[in-house]
Structures are given as structure tokens and as C-alpha cells.
Regions:
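Positively charged, low-complexity intrinsically disordered leader regions
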Residues: 1-42
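Short, well-ordered alpha-helix to beta-strand connector turns
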Residues: 3, 79, 99, 159, ...
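Redox-cofactor binding/interface segments in oxidoreductases and associated redox assembly factors
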Residues: 27, 82-84, 195-196
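Glycine-rich phosphate/diphosphate-binding loop of Rossmann-like nucleotide-binding domains
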Residues: 30-42, 126-198
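Short, structured coil segments at secondary-structure junctions
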Residues: 47, 98-100, 158, 176-177
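Short beta-strand elements in bilobed, periplasmic/extracellular small-molecule ligand-binding domains
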Residues: 48-61, 160-172
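Short, charged, surface-exposed secondary-structure boundary motifs
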Residues: 62-63, 112-119, 173-175, 190-192
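Anion-binding alpha/beta catalytic cores of soluble intermediary-metabolism enzymes, centered on
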Residues: 69-154
Length: 198
């Protein structure tokens, strides 16, 4: 419901609500990103938050500063919420122990990308009306994809049958919530939606 309300906000001439006025959100990207970082920055600004954009390439990380020290420095500067993307699994989870503010996982090594899964589920729900009993195929490099991992988990929780297809060398041994197959035609047969990974 909140996503639909925010979608209506985007259709207004002035795309802003005061929900986060007075809050500071830091997008802390320890690895490069375009779509995820900009999406979060726009969302925070549209909810009237002040936004600090952190880029690892131009930070003290280049001189050996740890993720923890970087986040503690931002906390000392008054940051209220952190959107974190890291190439190492578990950084977002660890961050919840290091800082008092809210932590949003914007991509976590090969392990997870829950916010992308939420967006994909929302898109599919808008297109299909429901995910209950729908067949969703995820195709590509499943083994190394945090998008496939998070997507399969969430879509199956929402009632979808998830089939992941890729070459045998790019399929994990198992993936909670998904049927794995090296046969593309099996995944695509009677699929209601197809997600193709890069």
C-alpha cells in the first residue's frame, strides 16, 4: 500500500512529502552502483530527508579505514539511516551492531539484495495482480546472483512457483524457495513472468 501511495506522489507536479523531514540518510556504497544508489537518494529526497552520498572510491577506505570506522564516523556526524551496499556478505547485518540508526541492505555480496526483491515483487504484483500460484522463471547466472537469491526467497513466500535456470556451472547446489534446472525450456514452459539476469 505504501508503494502505491508513493507512486501517486510521483505523478504530482511537486514530488515531495514531509515523511523524513529533519532526518539524514546516508547512501553508503562500498561498491559501485547506479540504479540502486540513485533510487534510494531520490526516494529519500522525495520524502524530504537530507541525503549524504558516500562513495568508497573517494573515501578513507582507500587508506585502510574499516567499514566499521567509516559508519561510526557517519553516526558521529548525525546520520539517522544508512543504505548500505557492500561486496562482502554480512556488512549490512554487522552494521546494525555498530550504529544506532536504521540500516537498509542495498546489496550484500553474493548473498542478498532484498530491496531489489521487493521492487521485483511489486512490479510482478502490479502486472499479474497476484503471485499466488504464478510461475516465475529466473534465468542466467544464478550461482553468483544476489538478485536471484533474494528474489526466489521472497517470490516463493508470496506464493509463486520459482524456477531458476542456467548452465550447470552457474547453478548453486540448492536455493531456498526455487526449483533449479539446467533446462531453459523447463523454466520457461507456462511461465507467467521471466526475469533475466545480466
Amino acid at each position: 500500500d505504501t508503494a502505491r501511495v508513493m507512486r501517486e506522489v510521483l505523478e504530482r507536479p511537486i514530488k515531495k512529502v514531509p515523511a523524513l523531514q529533519g532526518f539524514t540518510v546516508a547512501t553508503v556504497f562500498f561498491e559501485p552502483s547506479t540504479r540502486t544508489r540513485i533510487s534510494f537518494e531520490l526516494a529519500a529526497r522525495r520524502m524530504s530527508a537530507d541525503v549524504v552520498s558516500f562513495a568508497a572510491q573517494t573515501s578513507s577506505l582507500q587508506r585502510g579505514e574499516s567499514y566499521k570506522d567509516t559508519l561510526l564516523t557517519l553516526e558521529a556526524m548525525g546520520v539517522d539511516a544508512y543504505v548500505i551496499r557492500a561486496d562482502s556478505a554480512g556488512v549490512s547485518h554487522q552494521a546494525t551492531r555498530w550504529v544506532k540508526g536504521a540500516v537498509i541492505n542495498g546489496g550484500d555480496g553474493r548473498r542478498a539484495h532484498p530491496t531489489q526483491a521487493l521492487l521485483d515483487a511489486y512490479t510482478l504484483l502490479e502486472a499479474l495482480g497476484t503471485l499466488e500460484g504464478k510461475k516465475v522463471a529466473i534465468v542466467g547466472d544464478i550461482l553468483h546472483s544476489r538478485v536471484a537469491r533474494s528474489g526466489a526467497e521472497l517470490l516463493s513466500l508470496l506464493g509463486a512457483q520459482v524456477f531458476c535456470a542456467g548452465p550447470p556451472s552457474l547453478l548453486p547446489q540448492s536455493l531456498p524457495g526455487a526449483h533449479l534446472t539446467p533446462r531453459l525450456e523447463e523454466a520457461l514452459e507456462e511461465a507467467d513472468a521471466v526475469m533475466v539476469l545480466r
